[in-house]
């Protein structure tokens, strides 16, 4: 066998040293190909490994079925507050926060955390989710000024989270809905609010402004819907569909409360 190899090397005009180098180079190339084939799939899923572990860790902090059953069995809101105050994530309730405000704050914080930790290719959708807190605060601010609440009363309605929280909080001392819209002139919501403001001034109901914010949020979500796989797309589309349904149901309820007929409701 060794003699045959030596004969082949001689026929090719190669010295033993050159032949050895070629053999080593061939093995290196094959090894490199194997490494690439093995590592490329791993690199594709690597950005998801840390987010998945962190999401699972947060999932482990969700209320258990037993805890939810015990909450259902409470007799009044005071018992609900006492029960939740014993859970670390909701201990703020014991410090004077209302249940609703605490839960809204936790939701906003969760959206912010997820938006920061997810891989870049799916981050846009989660960044839009994190806008929910700002939109909720703008709605609360508009509602407060529509009924003439003062600065302290308005501040109590705000959720202390969101990218624009400080800007919105500074507007708690303004006097009217028009002042709120003017104060948000440098934000991404300026155009949609300005376009809806004349309808509010005509009808004196907040529905046009609230609906404009909801539409902007859902349209932003649809624009950011691209995700890496078909399975993820299906999950996200299902969530988007539920968001649209909830927005439309809330809109119908608001419209009925404001005694609007179909022709007045349909544009929203």
Residue ranges and their predicted role:
Residues 2-268:
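N-terminal domain-start signal
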């Amino acid at each position: 066998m060794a003699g045959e190899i030596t004969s082949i090397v001689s026929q090719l005009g190669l010295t033993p040293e050159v032949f050895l180098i070629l053999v080593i180079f061939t093995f290196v190339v094959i090894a490199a190909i194997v490494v690439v084939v093995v590592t490329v799939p791993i690199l594709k899923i690597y950005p998801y490994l840390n987010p998945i572990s962190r999401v699972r860790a947060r999932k482990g902090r969700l209320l258990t079925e037993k805890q939810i059953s015990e909450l259902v069995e409470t007799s009044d809101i005071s018992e609900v507050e006492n029960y939740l105050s014993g859970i670390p994530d909701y201990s703020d309730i014991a410090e004077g926060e209302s249940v609703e405000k605490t839960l809204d704050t936790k939701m906003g914080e969760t959206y912010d955390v997820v938006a920061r930790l997810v891989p870049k290719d799916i981050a846009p959708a989660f960044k839009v989710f994190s806008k929910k807190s700002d939109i909720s605060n703008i709605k609360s601010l508009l509602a407060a000024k529509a009924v003439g609440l003062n600065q302290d009363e308005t501040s109590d309605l705000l959720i202390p989270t969101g990218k624009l929280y400080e800007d919105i909080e500074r507007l708690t001392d303004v006097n009217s809905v028009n002042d709120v819209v003017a104060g948000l002139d440098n934000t991404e919501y300026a155009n949609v609010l300005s376009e809806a403001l004349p309808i509010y001034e005509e009808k004196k109901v907040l529905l046009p402004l609230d609906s404009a914010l909801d539409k902007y949020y859902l349209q932003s979500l649809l624009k950011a819907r691209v995700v890496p796989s078909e399975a993820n797309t299906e999950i996200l589309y299902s969530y988007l569909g539920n968001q649209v349904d909830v927005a439309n149901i809330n809109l119908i309820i608001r419209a009925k409360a404001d005694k609007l007929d179909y022709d007045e409701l349909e544009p929203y």
